[in-house]
Amino acid sequence: MRPHLLCFILGVLAVAAARAEGGCAPALDFAKRPLAGSEPVRLCEVYRGQVVMIVNTASKCAFTPQYEALEALYAKYRDRGFVVLGFPSNDFGGQEPGTEAQIQEFCRSTYGVKFPMFEKTHAGRAEADPLFRKLGELAGEYPRWNFHKYLLDRDGNLAASFGSFTRPDSREVVEKIEALLGD
């Protein structure tokens, strides 16, 4: 039994060492294609070291005006290492029926969205793609509607999860972002 315990301990130490040497945190260990783009990007490689807010979005939802607050947060804090990543989803009420090109045009022309938007994806628990499945597991909650917000610290660890009714510019969210930015 001791050899098995030793192997287990060495395995845990190897994983910890890999993360310490620039390995990827589980919440960012995914390749995702930018909206209306062709080549996936490794989230870990691009966003490592930043405070990241991941949001499932929709263009025809009562919460759609949250795009404005998300863009304002991004504009205010991006120079300090904060980024919003939007993932359109048609899972809740069929409220994101458009093509990726239509979604991109809507976001830019209606809300001036400049934060990164990614491929249309499944965010709901039943069909969650691997990114949202991992976030749901880490948070202990999956999006129940559009505009669920997951906040990751600079190491890619889940720091908070906010439901659709919590506005991106709410005091609770802003204070958490500022605490994570910490500078």
Describe the function of each predicted region:
Residues 48-52, 79-83, 111-116, 146, ...:
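Loop/turn elements at helix/coil->beta-strand transitions in domains of secreted/extracellular proteins
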Residues 56-60:
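Amphipathic alpha-helical repeat scaffolds
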Residues 63-128:
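Structural microenvironment flanking redox-active thiols in thiol-disulfide oxidoreductases
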Residues 30-51, 72-77:
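A short beta-strand-turn-helix
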Residues 130-183:
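Thiol-/selenol-based redox modules, centered on thioredoxin-like
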Residues 7-16:
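Bacterial N-terminal signal peptides
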Residues 18-24:
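Boundary at the C-terminal end of the N-terminal hydrophobic targeting segment
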Residues 1-4:
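Positively charged n-region of N-terminal signal peptides that target proteins for export
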